[in-house]
Design a protein with these regions (language model features):
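Aromatic-acidic/polar surface patches that form glycan- and anion
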Residues: 17-28, 43-46, 67-68, 105-109, ...
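Amphipathic alpha-helical segments that form well-ordered structural scaffolds
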Residues: 30-38, 115, 175-182
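Central helical "cap/lid" subdomain
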Residues: 49, 55, 64-125
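Conserved flavin/dinucleotide-binding core of flavoenzymes
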Residues: 59, 110, 126-268
């Protein structure tokens, strides 16, 4: 579906936004949960935010709420802008590194996402892909978010968070349902439930005070490809030179950081 300004929604052939790809049957968190189960007991600490990273004489000390952990290397896997806002680095990061991090926008950091759940994926029965691009909004894209075989049935969309500033999840959900009605007909107007997340308000996703100059131009910057002070490795998806902003980018950045640490360890 394509929704143009002042022209309403119209059906177009094919799928305008979704290409051939793979999806996690039980959500992307399934990968993280599976990997977490393979870690040694006590290796993973939840609800334990890092407050300070100190590099001194070849040793990295990471200070968190639970105490201090030392290592030879540290991997920063959160968005750089969030890292430099929330973590005190000592010695301070080089000026060019800090400036780059502050100016690197968090992918989807200023976005509201909504998932409308239905009893069945009725749009498939009438030959619709469940995908839409809208220039009228407030949601700019809609995707079929259903599980294997269409169950559970769901449509997902995202919109800029700024227009919803101060809105409740219920109000955002209602706006999404109204737009789905315009796009996919009356059956879309009454979802069983709408899940809403404002990523701009998530403490560990978006900085509390994003830089007004934040942009995606810093994605995959050369400074992210090598460790700062030889010990601090940047591995969020924004730092990836390949597919930045996507899961593939996060995997690529994590692999790059791991390889760099292995090389440094073997050479020590």
């Amino acid at each position: 579906m394509l929704e143009a300004v002042h022209r309403g929604a119209r059906r177009i052939e094919g799928n305008p936004i979704d290409t051939v790809s793979g999806r996690f049957a039980h959500g992307a968190q399934a990968l993280a949960l599976e990997l977490a189960e393979r870690l040694p007991a006590g290796a993973l600490r939840l609800r334990d935010p890092v407050m300070r990273v100190l590099v001194d004489d070849g040793v990295v000390a990471v200070e968190a709420a639970s105490g201090v952990t030392t290592a030879r290397h540290v991997v920063v896997a959160i968005p750089p802008a969030l890292a430099v806002e929330a973590i005190n680095f000592s010695p301070d990061l080089p000026a060019d590194m800090r400036s780059l991090a502050e100016g690197t926008a968090v992918w989807m950091g200023g976005v509201v996402k909504a998932v409308a759940v239905f009893d069945k994926a009725y749009w498939r029965d009438v030959g619709l892909a469940g995908a839409a691009v809208s220039y009228q909004g407030p949601f700019s894209e809609v995707h079929d978010h259903s599980g294997p075989g269409g169950s559970p049935a769901a449509l997902f969309g995202f919109a800029a968070a700024a227009p919803f500033d101060g809105a409740t999840p219920e109000q955002i959900g209602a706006a999404f349902a109204d737009q789905l009605y315009r796009l996919f007909g009356a059956a879309a107007a009454t979802p069983r439930h709408v899940h809403v997340t404002d990523w701009s308000a998530e403490r560990y996703t978006s900085p509390r005070a994003p830089s007004p100059r934040a942009a995606t131009t810093g994605y995959g910057h050369p400074l992210y490809q090598r460790p700062t002070a030889g010990r601090i490795h940047w591995a969020s998806t924004e730092t990836s030179a390949q597919h930045p902003g996507h899961i593939e980018g996060a995997l690529w950045a994590g692999t790059r950081a791991a390889r760099a640490i292995l090389v440094a360890t073997e050479a020590a």
